[in-house]
Protein backbone atom coordinates (compact mmCIF):
# COMPACT_ATOMS: atom_id res chain seq x y z
CA UNK A 1 0.00 0.00 0.00
CA UNK A 2 1.41 3.38 -1.01
CA UNK A 3 2.09 6.14 1.57
CA UNK A 4 -0.52 8.30 -0.18
CA UNK A 5 -3.15 5.56 0.22
CA UNK A 6 -2.30 5.18 3.93
CA UNK A 7 -2.70 8.92 4.41
CA UNK A 8 -6.16 8.91 2.86
CA UNK A 9 -7.14 5.86 4.93
CA UNK A 10 -6.19 7.74 8.12
CA UNK A 11 -8.22 10.74 6.94
CA UNK A 12 -11.15 8.44 6.14
CA UNK A 13 -11.03 6.95 9.64
CA UNK A 14 -11.07 10.45 11.16
CA UNK A 15 -13.93 11.45 8.86
CA UNK A 16 -15.99 8.42 9.96
CA UNK A 17 -15.36 9.18 13.64
CA UNK A 18 -15.69 12.97 13.64
CA UNK A 19 -17.99 14.04 10.83
CA UNK A 20 -20.10 10.91 10.44
CA UNK A 21 -19.94 10.20 14.19
CA UNK A 22 -20.11 6.48 13.65
CA UNK A 23 -19.49 4.15 16.57
CA UNK A 24 -15.98 2.86 17.19
CA UNK A 25 -17.24 -0.64 16.38
CA UNK A 26 -18.58 0.43 12.96
CA UNK A 27 -15.42 2.38 12.11
CA UNK A 28 -13.28 -0.60 13.09
CA UNK A 29 -15.40 -2.88 10.88
CA UNK A 30 -15.16 -0.50 7.92
CA UNK A 31 -11.37 -0.26 8.20
CA UNK A 32 -11.10 -4.04 8.42
CA UNK A 33 -13.33 -4.53 5.36
CA UNK A 34 -11.30 -2.02 3.33
CA UNK A 35 -8.11 -3.84 4.26
CA UNK A 36 -9.71 -7.15 3.30
CA UNK A 37 -10.79 -5.74 -0.05
CA UNK A 38 -7.41 -4.17 -0.82
CA UNK A 39 -5.65 -7.51 -0.34
CA UNK A 40 -7.77 -9.07 -3.09
CA UNK A 41 -7.18 -6.35 -5.68
CA UNK A 42 -5.03 -7.16 -8.73
CA UNK A 43 -1.37 -6.19 -8.69
CA UNK A 44 -0.90 -2.51 -9.47
CA UNK A 45 -4.39 -1.56 -8.26
CA UNK A 46 -4.93 0.04 -4.86
CA UNK A 47 -7.76 1.73 -2.98
CA UNK A 48 -7.14 5.03 -4.77
CA UNK A 49 -7.29 3.82 -8.39
CA UNK A 50 -9.65 0.86 -8.03
CA UNK A 51 -12.36 0.62 -10.71
CA UNK A 52 -15.84 -0.81 -10.66
CA UNK A 53 -14.73 -3.97 -12.47
CA UNK A 54 -12.09 -4.56 -9.77
CA UNK A 55 -14.65 -4.33 -6.97
CA UNK A 56 -16.93 -6.69 -8.89
CA UNK A 57 -14.08 -9.22 -9.05
CA UNK A 58 -13.41 -8.86 -5.32
CA UNK A 59 -17.12 -9.28 -4.58
CA UNK A 60 -17.13 -12.52 -6.58
CA UNK A 61 -14.03 -13.78 -4.73
CA UNK A 62 -15.55 -13.07 -1.33
CA UNK A 63 -18.77 -14.77 -2.39
CA UNK A 64 -16.83 -17.87 -3.51
CA UNK A 65 -15.04 -17.90 -0.17
CA UNK A 66 -18.41 -18.45 1.44
CA UNK A 67 -19.06 -15.07 3.02
CA UNK A 68 -22.68 -14.70 4.06
CA UNK A 69 -24.91 -12.08 2.40
CA UNK A 70 -24.79 -10.17 5.69
CA UNK A 71 -20.97 -10.05 5.65
CA UNK A 72 -20.92 -9.08 1.98
CA UNK A 73 -23.35 -6.25 2.71
CA UNK A 74 -21.03 -4.93 5.42
CA UNK A 75 -18.07 -5.05 3.03
CA UNK A 76 -20.08 -3.23 0.36
CA UNK A 77 -21.08 -0.54 2.85
CA UNK A 78 -17.41 0.01 3.68
CA UNK A 79 -16.21 0.39 0.08
CA UNK A 80 -19.19 2.60 -0.81
CA UNK A 81 -18.42 4.92 2.11
CA UNK A 82 -14.77 4.93 1.04
CA UNK A 83 -15.77 5.87 -2.50
CA UNK A 84 -18.00 8.70 -1.26
CA UNK A 85 -15.14 10.00 0.89
CA UNK A 86 -12.73 10.03 -2.07
CA UNK A 87 -15.41 11.75 -4.16
CA UNK A 88 -15.81 14.49 -1.52
CA UNK A 89 -12.05 14.84 -1.31
CA UNK A 90 -11.74 15.38 -5.07
CA UNK A 91 -9.59 12.29 -5.59
CA UNK A 92 -12.06 10.61 -7.94
CA UNK A 93 -14.97 11.75 -10.10
CA UNK A 94 -17.18 8.66 -9.78
CA UNK A 95 -17.70 6.23 -6.90
CA UNK A 96 -16.68 2.83 -8.37
CA UNK A 97 -18.70 0.96 -5.73
CA UNK A 98 -21.97 2.78 -6.42
CA UNK A 99 -24.70 0.39 -7.56
CA UNK A 100 -22.94 -2.79 -6.48
CA UNK A 101 -25.14 -5.13 -4.47
CA UNK A 102 -24.67 -8.31 -2.49
CA UNK A 103 -26.71 -11.48 -3.09
CA UNK A 104 -30.02 -11.28 -1.27
CA UNK A 105 -30.15 -12.80 2.17
CA UNK A 106 -32.17 -15.97 2.15
CA UNK A 107 -35.42 -15.57 3.99
CA UNK A 108 -35.75 -18.03 6.84
CA UNK A 109 -38.29 -20.72 6.13
CA UNK A 110 -41.38 -20.52 8.28
CA UNK A 111 -41.56 -23.45 10.66
CA UNK A 112 -44.54 -25.70 10.22
CA UNK A 113 -46.39 -27.55 12.95
CA UNK A 114 -45.99 -31.31 12.77
CA UNK A 115 -49.02 -33.52 12.18
CA UNK A 116 -49.23 -34.79 15.77
CA UNK A 117 -49.16 -31.25 17.17
CA UNK A 118 -51.83 -30.17 14.67
CA UNK A 119 -54.02 -33.05 15.80
CA UNK A 120 -53.52 -32.02 19.41
CA UNK A 121 -54.34 -28.38 18.62
CA UNK A 122 -57.54 -29.33 16.83
CA UNK A 123 -58.64 -31.69 19.60
CA UNK A 124 -60.05 -28.80 21.64
CA UNK A 125 -63.19 -29.69 23.56
CA UNK A 126 -66.24 -27.66 24.44
CA UNK A 127 -69.71 -26.95 23.08
CA UNK A 128 -69.84 -23.24 23.78
CA UNK A 129 -70.17 -20.99 20.70
CA UNK A 130 -66.66 -19.50 20.87
CA UNK A 131 -64.95 -22.88 21.12
CA UNK A 132 -67.00 -24.32 18.25
CA UNK A 133 -66.31 -21.24 16.14
CA UNK A 134 -62.58 -21.28 16.84
CA UNK A 135 -62.32 -24.99 16.11
CA UNK A 136 -64.10 -24.47 12.78
CA UNK A 137 -61.70 -21.63 11.94
CA UNK A 138 -58.58 -23.67 12.71
CA UNK A 139 -59.91 -26.76 10.94
CA UNK A 140 -60.59 -24.66 7.84
CA UNK A 141 -57.17 -23.00 7.92
CA UNK A 142 -55.43 -26.37 8.07
CA UNK A 143 -57.85 -28.16 5.74
CA UNK A 144 -57.68 -25.64 2.90
CA UNK A 145 -54.58 -23.50 3.47
CA UNK A 146 -56.45 -20.20 3.35
CA UNK A 147 -54.87 -16.82 4.00
CA UNK A 148 -56.10 -14.89 7.04
CA UNK A 149 -57.80 -12.25 4.88
CA UNK A 150 -59.46 -14.94 2.76
CA UNK A 151 -60.94 -16.76 5.74
CA UNK A 152 -62.10 -13.57 7.46
CA UNK A 153 -63.92 -12.51 4.27
CA UNK A 154 -65.91 -15.75 3.90
CA UNK A 155 -69.69 -15.50 3.84
CA UNK A 156 -72.29 -18.15 4.59
CA UNK A 157 -72.67 -18.79 0.87
CA UNK A 158 -68.92 -19.33 0.38
CA UNK A 159 -68.96 -22.93 1.60
CA UNK A 160 -70.48 -25.62 -0.63
CA UNK A 161 -71.19 -28.39 1.87
CA UNK A 162 -72.34 -31.07 -0.57
CA UNK A 163 -69.26 -30.59 -2.76
CA UNK A 164 -66.91 -30.09 0.21
CA UNK A 165 -65.60 -26.88 -1.35
CA UNK A 166 -65.09 -23.26 -0.40
CA UNK A 167 -65.15 -20.35 -2.81
CA UNK A 168 -62.34 -17.95 -1.95
CA UNK A 169 -61.57 -14.42 -3.11
CA UNK A 170 -57.78 -14.21 -3.06
CA UNK A 171 -55.16 -11.60 -3.86
CA UNK A 172 -55.97 -9.37 -6.80
CA UNK A 173 -59.66 -10.28 -6.39
CA UNK A 174 -58.97 -13.63 -8.05
CA UNK A 175 -61.53 -16.26 -7.18
CA UNK A 176 -60.58 -19.88 -6.65
CA UNK A 177 -62.36 -22.97 -5.37
CA UNK A 178 -60.57 -24.99 -2.71
CA UNK A 179 -61.49 -28.44 -1.35
CA UNK A 180 -62.54 -28.68 2.29
CA UNK A 181 -61.88 -31.80 4.35
CA UNK A 182 -64.50 -33.77 6.23
CA UNK A 183 -63.34 -32.65 9.69
CA UNK A 184 -63.54 -29.01 8.66
CA UNK A 185 -67.03 -29.45 7.19
CA UNK A 186 -68.20 -31.11 10.40
CA UNK A 187 -66.66 -28.35 12.53
CA UNK A 188 -68.26 -25.60 10.42
CA UNK A 189 -71.64 -27.35 10.58
CA UNK A 190 -71.40 -27.53 14.39
CA UNK A 191 -70.56 -23.83 14.54
CA UNK A 192 -73.46 -22.87 12.25
CA UNK A 193 -75.95 -24.39 14.69
CA UNK A 194 -74.72 -21.90 17.30
CA UNK A 195 -74.46 -19.05 14.83
CA UNK A 196 -78.21 -19.29 14.14
CA UNK A 197 -78.82 -18.15 17.71
CA UNK A 198 -76.77 -14.96 17.22
CA UNK A 199 -78.33 -11.83 15.76
CA UNK A 200 -75.93 -11.10 12.90
CA UNK A 201 -75.45 -7.86 10.99
CA UNK A 202 -74.36 -9.51 7.74
CA UNK A 203 -73.75 -12.88 6.10
CA UNK A 204 -70.24 -13.36 7.48
CA UNK A 205 -69.41 -17.01 8.15
CA UNK A 206 -67.43 -16.26 11.30
CA UNK A 207 -68.82 -13.62 13.66
CA UNK A 208 -68.35 -12.31 17.18
CA UNK A 209 -70.82 -12.86 20.01
CA UNK A 210 -72.38 -9.55 18.98
CA UNK A 211 -72.90 -10.72 15.41
CA UNK A 212 -70.15 -8.68 13.76
CA UNK A 213 -67.70 -10.13 11.24
CA UNK A 214 -64.66 -11.44 13.07
CA UNK A 215 -61.61 -9.20 12.54
CA UNK A 216 -58.14 -10.35 11.50
CA UNK A 217 -56.72 -9.40 14.87
CA UNK A 218 -59.39 -11.31 16.76
CA UNK A 219 -58.72 -14.46 14.73
CA UNK A 220 -54.99 -14.16 15.41
CA UNK A 221 -55.55 -13.61 19.13
CA UNK A 222 -57.91 -16.59 19.47
CA UNK A 223 -55.52 -18.92 17.66
CA UNK A 224 -52.62 -17.78 19.83
CA UNK A 225 -54.77 -18.45 22.90
CA UNK A 226 -55.57 -22.00 21.79
CA UNK A 227 -51.93 -22.72 21.02
CA UNK A 228 -51.05 -21.77 24.59
CA UNK A 229 -53.95 -23.68 26.12
CA UNK A 230 -53.04 -26.81 24.17
CA UNK A 231 -49.42 -26.36 25.27
CA UNK A 232 -47.89 -26.31 21.80
CA UNK A 233 -44.16 -25.60 21.74
CA UNK A 234 -44.51 -22.80 19.18
CA UNK A 235 -46.77 -19.81 18.71
CA UNK A 236 -49.85 -20.60 16.65
CA UNK A 237 -51.06 -18.12 14.05
CA UNK A 238 -52.99 -18.34 10.75
CA UNK A 239 -49.97 -18.41 8.45
CA UNK A 240 -48.44 -21.19 10.54
CA UNK A 241 -51.45 -23.40 9.74
CA UNK A 242 -51.35 -22.35 6.08
CA UNK A 243 -47.67 -23.26 5.93
CA UNK A 244 -48.31 -26.56 7.69
CA UNK A 245 -51.08 -27.36 5.20
CA UNK A 246 -48.71 -26.71 2.28
CA UNK A 247 -45.82 -28.66 3.78
CA UNK A 248 -47.90 -31.69 4.71
CA UNK A 249 -49.56 -31.72 1.28
CA UNK A 250 -46.19 -31.67 -0.47
CA UNK A 251 -44.80 -34.35 1.83
CA UNK A 252 -47.70 -36.59 0.87
CA UNK A 253 -48.03 -35.84 -2.84
CA UNK A 254 -45.02 -33.76 -4.01
CA UNK A 255 -47.40 -32.17 -6.55
CA UNK A 256 -46.07 -28.62 -6.56
CA UNK A 257 -48.48 -27.36 -9.22
CA UNK A 258 -51.52 -28.63 -7.35
CA UNK A 259 -50.39 -27.02 -4.10
CA UNK A 260 -49.72 -23.79 -6.01
CA UNK A 261 -53.36 -23.76 -7.15
CA UNK A 262 -54.66 -24.58 -3.68
CA UNK A 263 -52.65 -21.79 -2.07
CA UNK A 264 -53.56 -19.27 -4.75
CA UNK A 265 -49.94 -18.45 -5.60
CA UNK A 266 -49.48 -16.64 -8.89
CA UNK A 267 -45.85 -17.77 -9.22
CA UNK A 268 -44.57 -21.27 -8.67
CA UNK A 269 -41.44 -19.84 -7.03
CA UNK A 270 -43.59 -18.66 -4.11
CA UNK A 271 -44.82 -22.20 -3.54
CA UNK A 272 -41.29 -23.60 -3.71
CA UNK A 273 -40.39 -22.18 -0.29
CA UNK A 274 -42.50 -24.98 1.15
CA UNK A 275 -40.45 -27.71 -0.55
CA UNK A 276 -37.57 -27.69 1.92
CA UNK A 277 -38.48 -31.08 3.32
CA UNK A 278 -36.26 -32.75 5.86
CA UNK A 279 -33.75 -35.26 4.51
CA UNK A 280 -35.22 -38.15 6.47
CA UNK A 281 -38.54 -37.71 4.69
CA UNK A 282 -36.87 -37.40 1.28
CA UNK A 283 -34.77 -40.48 1.90
CA UNK A 284 -37.87 -42.44 2.88
CA UNK A 285 -39.69 -41.36 -0.28
CA UNK A 286 -36.64 -42.31 -2.35
CA UNK A 287 -36.35 -45.74 -0.73
CA UNK A 288 -40.03 -46.44 -1.32
CA UNK A 289 -40.25 -45.07 -4.85
CA UNK A 290 -37.00 -45.77 -6.69
CA UNK A 291 -36.88 -49.25 -8.28
CA UNK A 292 -33.23 -49.72 -7.39
CA UNK A 293 -33.36 -48.11 -3.97
CA UNK A 294 -35.58 -50.61 -2.20
CA UNK A 295 -33.62 -52.29 0.54
CA UNK A 296 -33.50 -56.05 0.68
CA UNK A 297 -35.49 -57.66 3.43
CA UNK A 298 -33.43 -59.24 6.18
CA UNK A 299 -33.16 -62.96 5.60
From Swiss-Prot:
Highest rank taxon of the organism: Bacteria
Tyr recombinase domain: residues covered: 108-287
Domain Core-binding (CB), residue spans: 3-87
Pfam families assigned: Phage_int_SAM_1, Phage_integrase
Keyword line: Cell cycle, Cell division, Chromosome partition, Cytoplasm, DNA integration, DNA recombination, DNA-binding
Full protein name: Tyrosine recombinase XerC
InterPro entries: CB, DNA_brk_join_enz, Integrase-like_cat_sf, Integrase_catalytic, Integrase_recombinase_N, Integrase_SAM-like_N, Recomb_XerC, Tyrosine_recombinase_XerC/XerD
Any one of the GO CC terms: cytoplasm
Active site: 147, 171, 239, 242, 265, 274 (o-(3'-phospho-dna)-tyrosine intermediate)
MF term (GO), any: tyrosine-based site-specific recombinase activity
PANTHER family membership: PHAGE INTEGRASE-RELATED, TYROSINE RECOMBINASE XERC
Record family assignment: Belongs to the 'phage' integrase family. XerC subfamily.
Assembly mode: Forms a cyclic heterotetrameric complex composed of two molecules of XerC and two molecules of XerD.
Primary residence: cytoplasm
SUPFAM superfamilies: DNA breaking-rejoining enzymes, lambda integrase-like, N-terminal domain
Biological-process GO terms, alphabetical: cell division; chromosome segregation; DNA transposition
Function: Site-specific tyrosine recombinase, which acts by catalyzing the cutting and rejoining of the recombining DNA molecules. The XerC-XerD complex is essential to convert dimers of the bacterial chromosome into monomers to permit their segregation at cell division. It also contributes to the segregational stability of plasmids.
Compartment list: Cytoplasm
Amino acid sequence: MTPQCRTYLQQFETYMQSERQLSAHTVRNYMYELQRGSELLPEGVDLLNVGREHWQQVLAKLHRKGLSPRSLSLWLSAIKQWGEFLLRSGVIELNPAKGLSAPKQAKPLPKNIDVDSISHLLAIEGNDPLTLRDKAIMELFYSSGLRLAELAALDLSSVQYDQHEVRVLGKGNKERIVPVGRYAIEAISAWLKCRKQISCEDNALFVTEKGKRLSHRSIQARMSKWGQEQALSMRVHPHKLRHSFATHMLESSADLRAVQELLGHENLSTTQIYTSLDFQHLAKVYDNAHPRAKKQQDK
